[in-house]
A protein has these predicted regions:
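Bacterial Sec-dependent N-terminal signal peptides
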Residues: 1-32
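The feature captures the conserved acid-bearing segment of alpha/beta-hydrolase catalytic domains
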Residues: 186-272
Length: 310
């Protein structure tokens, strides 16, 4: 694989270590496995990204896991962390799947220093101080730009990527699907989100599309997206401390499992109302609760099936 540095990435911290894979590493343990070397090394790595101009003053760290694979056609999947902003843990949770399916794991960490709350991360920075921000400043834009950087570095020649997010990351991912143009995404997997922006206009943004930037005539292309809702069947705790309990959120269901199903059924109903083709899918994972490590193998399998069908 021809891996080279590229001059336009302003700030880059290169990291690597050759270690055995593990799914339960803590943030500190994975950091210990990282040492300075070339861009996107084998095993664990990280780099600092600030090359998207509208957000260049708000750099983020991107963690990676590269399996033992030397061809330049390695598939890429973005893995989005939850509200704890622990991207390195998420990368560790995906290491075994990376080796099994030979996929590059890319885990951006949307840090609290520059993106301090759910409005900046889970909601994509769309709506701050009671007003919509400029679309070019939405954090959704980081994904395609990081992917372009990886392509330009000659790490891979693939033209598309997958994206998965768990919990708060699932919130980011389903809004990424609704409010950005994910033309390079081959599969979009929101998993175990705490609450949703529903794909209808009966609720006001951010709980629905009423008063949002998404016009109803755009729903046709949104319902054609390769979106797969992935839910842990045991993610049913109505008293979870981090579960949003506003009236609008409670109308979606009493726990994450119910809310995920509601997100799917309301979108399907809206598509039927408008006589639109509906490509979204929903899958449940037995014996798994609110756990990224528990959901990762099923998400990786869904991504691999997408690769096999293309």
């Amino acid at each position: 694989m021809n891996i080279k540095h590229f001059k336009y990435l302003r700030v880059i911290i290169i990291t690597m270590v050759i270690v055995s894979t593990g799914c339960e590493d803590s943030n500190e343990k994975i950091e210990e496995k990282i040492a300075n070397t070339s861009f996107i090394p084998f095993k664990y790595g990280k780099f600092e990204y600030n090359d998207y101009e509208p957000l260049s003053d708000k750099p983020i760290t991107v963690y990676t896991y590269m399996p033992d694979y030397t061809n330049d056609d390695i598939p890429v999947i973005f893995v989005m962390h939850g509200q704890n902003r622990d991207a390195s843990n998420y990368c560790g949770d995906w290491a075994t799947s990376a080796e099994k399916y030979k996929i590059l794991i890319v885990c951006p960490e949307i840090n609290e220093l520059y993106y301090p709350n759910s409005q900046y991360y889970q909601q994509g920075g769309m709506f701050i101080d009671n007003k919509f921000t400029e679309p070019e400043k939405w954090t959704f834009n980081l994904i395609d730009n990081i992917f372009s950087t990886i392509q330009d570095s000659n790490v891979t020649k693939v033209k598309t990527y997958g994206i998965y997010g768990h919990s708060g990351g699932g919130q980011f991912v389903h809004r990424f699907a609704l409010f950005s143009e994910p033309k390079n995404a081959s599969i979009i997997i929101p998993s175990n989100s705490g609450w949703y922006t529903l794909a209808h206009y009966k609720e006001t943004f951010p709980y629905g599309l009423n008063n949002s930037p998404l016009n109803e005539n755009i729903l046709k292309e949104k319902f054609l997206l390769p979106l797969v809702i992935l839910l842990g069947e045991n993610d049913t705790d109505p008293n979870s401390a981090s579960l949003r309990k506003t009236d609008e959120a409670m109308r979606q269901g009493s726990h994450r499992y119910a809310r995920g199903k509601y997100f799917y059924t309301t979108a399907k109903s809206k598509a039927e109302e408008l006589s639109l083709q509906f490509n979204w899918k929903i899958f449940t994972v037995p014996n798994v609760g609110h756990s990224n490590a528990g959901m990762a193998p099923s998400a990786a399998e869904q991504f691999y099936k997408t690769l096999s069908n293309n």
